């Protein structure tokens, strides 16, 4: 984890409130490209029972670390409505 110098918060919205968030989180962790790290995952209540998953993705500020790779991988997972980068910060 010490090699990483950036953290991006990626907000993932499930397709509906009935989605099993534990299963969805596990699937998303599996598809995270290997070169990226994961600091933590939080759950954010939105409205009407819908809960977003917030992935704190670790990366390096160098060529080859394109967050679009993470977004595309996440968007391909079943029951994912959307995946967007909320913030990017240096660490």
Curated annotation (Swiss-Prot):
Q: Does the keyword section mention Protein biosynthesis?
A: yes
Per the UniProt entry, the disulfide pairs are none
Which Gene3D superfamilies has this protein been placed in? Answer: 3.30.70.60
Keywords from UniProt, A to Z, are: Elongation factor, Protein biosynthesis
Q: Which residues form a coiled coil?
A: none
A Pfam family reported for this protein in Swiss-Prot or TrEMBL = EF1_GNE
Q: Which InterPro entries match?
A: eEF-1beta-like_sf, EF1B_bsu/dsu_GNE, Transl_elong_EF1B/ribsomal_bS6, Transl_elong_EF1B_B_arc
Highest taxon listed in the record's lineage: Archaea
One GO MF term attached to the UniProt entry: translation elongation factor activity
Concerning PANTHER family, the annotation shows: ELONGATION FACTOR 1-BETA
Q: What does this protein do?
A: Promotes the exchange of GDP for GTP in EF-1-alpha/GDP, thus allowing the regeneration of EF-1-alpha/GTP that could then be used to form the ternary complex EF-1-alpha/GTP/AAtRNA.
Family according to the record: Belongs to the EF-1-beta/EF-1-delta family.
Q: Know the name of this protein?
A: Elongation factor 1-beta
């Amino acid at each position: 984890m010490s090699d990483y110098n950036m953290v991006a918060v990626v907000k993932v919205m499930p397709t509906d409130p009935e989605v099993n968030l534990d299963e969805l989180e596990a699937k998303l962790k599996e598809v995270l490209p290997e070169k990226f790290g994961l600091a933590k995952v939080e759950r954010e209540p939105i409205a009407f029972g819908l809960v977003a998953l917030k992935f704190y993705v670790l990366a390096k500020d160098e060529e080859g670390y394109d967050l679009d790779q993470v977004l595309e991988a996440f968007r391909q997972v079943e029951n994912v409505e959307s995946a967007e980068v909320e913030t990017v910060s240096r660490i």
